[in-house]
Amino acid sequence: MRHYLLVFAACATLAANSYGQRRPEDELKVPDPEAVTVEASDGVPIRCSFYPGGFIETPTDKKDKPKVEKKPGKEVVPIILLHGWEGRRRDFDELASNLQKRGHAVMVPDLRGHGDSNKVTLPNGETKDIERDRMRSTDLAGMLLDVEAVKKFLFEKNNAGELNIELLCVGGADVGAIVAVNWAAYDWSRRQLPAFKQGRDVKALVLVSPEASFKGYSLTTALNHPVIQKTLSVMIIVGEDDRSAAREAKTIHSRLERLRDAPTDPKDADLVYIKPNTTLQGTQLINVPGLPLRDYIGFFIEQRLVRKSSEFPWTQRTSPL
């Protein structure tokens, strides 16, 4: 019996050590991006990269071993990034990775007609190529369906307790910025049901080299939405040395600025305008070495969403329908 007790005690000690001490291979690390496909309501498969949130990485003295801490899923900010015309989701690889390491969950789609989202499934089951060069304003408006499908994916993650959809941020570059503003206006125009909240989840926009219109697809009407005019946190970034791009971005900024009160503390600004001296635009501007634009975006999200998360608490959003 004494031998049995000694063996049991030894096993218990080993078990306690295995649970109490994390082995090197079990140490937390920021997950790799996942390849995800969502389907827009008109049958277009949208290929995406999803960067799971909830992991905050900070540098340590050991340069090759950063410290990673876990963040509660219900506090995770979800972010959708929309590339520009003739772009693709990998254009946002660096920004998405940067934001993921700050604890956020990031979803980056190839918008229809771009990257790997270049086919549509017809009612008869056949597939047809999407010819980007032949896309017109109505086709560009169809990108709203792409974003809605992406949001549905994030919505499911919300209900699984992996993120808080109430803290949604949408970013876009050039044409992607037009889509972002139009989709935000749509999200805030959803009809509300007595027992179920629909939409009204976008709380911040990041617009990189925003254009007023492209191929007849415009953000002018969406900018007139009262929530976008006065309530949403908006960051605008443009390379100032490109006069045409700077003029369009300044016009958009001015339309929003005149309807908002100036903050007493710049850190409390809900409208931020960044204009580095360069001709680069869109994702090329975000990715240029030497400009801390990714850090600026991260700080903006920290100030406008993370620090205000108590104002938008997580809720279970299961539809009664």
Short names for language-model regions:
Residues 194-268:
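The feature captures the conserved acid-bearing segment of alpha/beta-hydrolase catalytic domains
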Residues 85-97:
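The serine-hydrolase catalytic nucleophile loop
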Residues 21-73:
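N-terminal cap/lid segment of alpha/beta-hydrolase-fold proteins
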Residues 99-127:
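Conserved alpha/beta-hydrolase
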Residues 262-321:
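C-terminal catalytic histidine-bearing segment of alpha/beta-hydrolase fold enzymes
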Residues 125-161:
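Alpha/beta-hydrolase active-site loop
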Residues 161-174:
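Alpha/beta-hydrolase fold nucleophile elbow
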Residues 76-79, 83-87:
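Active-site glycine-rich loops that stabilize anionic/oxyanionic intermediates
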